[in-house]
Amino acid sequence: MTLNIRIIAPDRTVWDAEAQEIILPSSTGQLGILTGHAPLLTALDIGVMRVRVDKEWMPIVLLGGFAEIENNQLTILVNGAEEASQIDLVEAEKNLDTATQLLNDASSSKEKIEATQNIRKARARVQAATAASA
């Protein structure tokens, strides 16, 4: 059996295919989903989702959202998503360095919050690109 997975971002459908297993970055930690999973609605955090198709794992960066599983149908609504194969690792590492420097230079609470979010996004991109190139 397989899971039918649909990942929808505001601007496009990111993924619409079947897979054997999913690992989601939920707001309470990593969440593994296999066929026959109990119905569930969960909030997603910024992080790397891993999709297993046959014996290959594919990382996808998620920028927060929600996931619903019911009857082997997994619907994921996200604020944004990026497939690891489209991420340039060198650029992602530069973005992480820049975001870290912005956090160090931040003086207001708002700047610190924005910089922290940018670091989380950049870190997820680096993790996904590294996993894809391994």
UniProtKB/Swiss-Prot annotation:
Q: Which UniProt keywords apply?
A: ATP synthesis, CF(1), Chloroplast, Hydrogen ion transport, Ion transport, Membrane, Plastid, Thylakoid, Transport
Q: How does it sit in the membrane?
A: Peripheral membrane protein
Keyword DNA-binding assigned to the entry: answer is no
UniProt cross-references to InterPro entries, sorted A to Z? ATP_synth_F1_dsu/esu, ATP_synth_F1_dsu/esu_N, ATP_synth_F1_esu_C, ATPsynth_dsu/esu_N
Cell compartment(s), UniProt:
Plastid, Chloroplast thylakoid membrane
Q: From which domain of life does this come?
A: Eukaryota
* A cellular-component GO term for this protein: proton-transporting ATP synthase complex
Instruction: Output the Gene Ontology terms for molecular function.
Output: ATP binding; proton-transporting ATP synthase activity, rotational mechanism
State the family named in the UniProt similarity comment for this chain.
Belongs to the ATPase epsilon chain family.
Q: What does this protein do?
A: Produces ATP from ADP in the presence of a proton gradient across the membrane.
Tell me how this protein assembles.
Answer: F-type ATPases have 2 components, CF(1) - the catalytic core - and CF(0) - the membrane proton channel. CF(1) has five subunits: alpha(3), beta(3), gamma(1), delta(1), epsilon(1). CF(0) has three main subunits: a, b and c.
Q: What is this protein called?
A: ATP synthase epsilon chain, chloroplastic
Lineage at the top is: Eukaryota, Rhodophyta, Bangiophyceae, Bangiales, Bangiaceae
Q: Which gene encodes it?
A: atpE
